[in-house]
Design a protein with these regions (language model features):
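Catalytic phosphate/metal-binding cores of nucleic-acid and nucleotide-processing enzymes, i.e., regions
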Residues: 10, 24-33, 41, 89, ...
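Conserved C-terminal active-site "lid" loop/helix of NAD(P)H-dependent oxidoreductases
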Residues: 52-58, 74-119
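Residues that recognize and position ribonucleotide moieties
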Residues: 12, 21, 49-50, 87
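NAD(P)-dependent short-chain dehydrogenase/reductase
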Residues: 1-20, 25-30
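Mid/C-terminal beta-alpha module of Rossmann-like enzyme folds, strongest
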Residues: 31-85
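Conserved residues at beta->alpha junctions
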Residues: 19, 47, 98
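Short, amphipathic alpha-helical "lid/cap" segments that border enzyme active or binding sites
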Residues: 3, 25-36, 105-112
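Hydrophobic residues at beta-strand termini and immediately following loops
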Residues: 14-15, 45, 104
Length: 119
């Protein structure tokens, strides 16, 4: 947890060889109704991402207003260095049905700006 590490003065490591999407829950809620009318099949459902975990962590810390994220978020260059870990999703199929998710960075920004969104 970024806020906790910052508040406690502790450090966390984030992998530079790992890629994963982070989806703002409100986007899931907004899109779930649309997904209910899809024909049967396998669909990836969530935010895309091109940044590694370390970059996502530092971007999120900056958006949260946490000062000098490089002092408490450390790049873990060894984890997954033998084989890059890519957990990102290709959502092009679901997008063809009008279901769109912002990328992870935009989703995090929305969550920071409007954490208790009700619309």
């Amino acid at each position: 947890n970024l806020q906790k590490a910052y508040d406690e003065g502790s450090q966390i490591k984030a992998a530079t060889h790992e890629y994963r999407g982070v989806t703002y829950v409100w986007e899931v809620i907004k899109n779930i109704e649309k997904a209910m009318s899809l024909s049967g099949g396998i669909y990836n459902f969530g935010s895309g991402n091109t940044l590694n975990s370390y970059s996502i962590f530092t971007e999120a810390a900056n958006m949260m207003g946490l000062k000098e994220p490089s002092k408490f978020i450390l790049p873990d260059t060894e984890r997954f260095s033998d084989q890059e870990r890519n957990l990102t999703m290709d959502c092009s199929l679901i997008e063809k049905h009008g279901i769109h998710f912002n990328d992870s960075t935009e989703g995090i920004k929305e969550a920071v700006l409007r954490p208790f969104r009700t619309e």
